[in-house]
Amino acid sequence: MAYQNFEDLEVWKKGRVLKNEIFETVKSFPSEEKFRLTDQLIRSSRSVTTQIAEGHGRRTFPDRIRFCIIARGSLSETLNHFLDAVD
């Protein structure tokens, strides 16, 4: 399947859904977490889609792969923050 924009990528679309769900979820967090866990969750989830978009804009395949790896790391960071929230 050919695509023109990063918005066409299924992985970016799923990352966007995750990011939006996180934005809704953190609204229920205690106010004392606003600048701690809430901020970390928002930043790491934004990084997932940001890295995918940036990688899409790179010209070389190794650069694209590198940004996918970074996005995966941001996704793992987001999962870790969710686990912290449960604890």
Question: Which residue stretches match the model-derived regions?
Answer:
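Amphipathic alpha-helical assembly/interaction segments
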Residues: 1-87
